[in-house]
Curated annotation (Swiss-Prot):
This is BI1-like protein. The keyword Transmembrane applies. Keywords: Membrane, Transmembrane, Transmembrane helix. Belongs to the BI1 family. The gene is LFG5. It comes from the Eukaryota. Pfam families: Bax1-I. It is found in: Membrane. Its main location: membrane. It is a multi-pass membrane protein. The chain crosses the membrane at residues 53-73, 85-105, 113-133, 138-158, 167-187, 189-209, 228-248. The keyword Transmembrane helix applies. One of its GO terms (cellular component) is membrane.
Length: 256
């Protein structure tokens, strides 16, 4: 059969078809190999999973941004939340209640998405209240810093994974650090910390959540199974949200 004008036939006889397993972006074809030893087919599936998780995460962050904007820009909504401790307390408790069914039904569609939406909305209102109680300039600074840190840490983790580095060892260290943060936060309710201690606590908190971003991104690349996309998105969402709130608190205290 004649070839269309401008096209030429290419013989595949001299090409090793098995080499396709090692194709990556550096060769100009396919997608970058996520980490050493990953087969071509598994690499393609893993990239699809990662795109799905980041798609869900982007939707969560967008929803949080929109709800926070509504709370900040609408004084009646803000007054209702800040003037009703019961409502605000309920919104703070709901995410903790939803964590359990989210874990149980993370594979059951569409229940998992409904629970995820409720989880995100309840947290978004609390974030909105925190932003409404802070000067707009500081909120913008915290947002820019958070985006910069998250982007840098994510890029580094993907690069490190490709070079064969593993961050699973961070799990026990970060969990212990998180327990220390929770206990210290509880102690602050009865014995307020001084300015220096508060600054140290804020810096340590930011460091812990930065570590969690690296750890959970590494899990996304290597360890989360393909049906755990909800759990992966929730983990990264909480990491980013906690880092933003920590930076917001540090900047607010520094401004005061």
């Amino acid at each position: 059969m004649d070839k269309p004008y401008g096209y030429a036939s290419v013989s595949m006889s001299g090409i090793d078809r098995s080499a396709g397993k090692d194709i990556d972006l550096e060769m100009g074809v396919g997608e970058a190999t996520l980490y050493p030893g990953l087969s071509y087919g598994e690499n393609q599936l893993r990239w699809g999973f990662i795109r799905k998780v980041y798609g869900i995460l982007s939707a969560q962050l967008l929803l949080t941004t929109l709800i926070s904007a509504v709370v900040v820009l609408n004084p009646p909504v803000n007054d209702l939340l800040t003037g009703s401790p019961g409502i605000l307390l309920f919104l703070c408790i709901v995410p903790f209640i939803l964590i359990w069914p989210l874990h149980i039904y993370h594979q059951k569609h569409p229940v998992n998405l409904i629970l995820l939406a409720l989880f995100t909305v309840s947290l978004s209102f609390t974030v909105g209240v925190s932003c409404a109680m802070t000067e707009g300039r500081i909120v913008l600074q915290a947002l820019i810093l958070t985006l910069s840190v998250v982007g840098s840490l994510t890029a580094y983790t993907f690069w490190a994974a490709k070079k064969g580095k593993d961050f699973s060892f961070l799990g026990p260290i970060l969990f212990t650090s998180l327990i220390i943060l929770v206990v210290t936060s509880f102690i602050q309710m009865f014995f307020p910390l001084g300015p220096t201690s508060v600054a140290v606590y804020g810096g340590f908190s930011a460091l812990v959540f930065c570590g969690y971003i690296v750890y959970d991104t590494d899990n996304l690349i290597k360890r989360f199974t393909y049906d755990e996309y909800i759990l992966a998105s929730v983990a990264l969402y909480l990491d980013i949200l906690n880092l933003f709130l920590t930076i917001l608190r540090i900047l607010r205290q520094g401004d005061n």
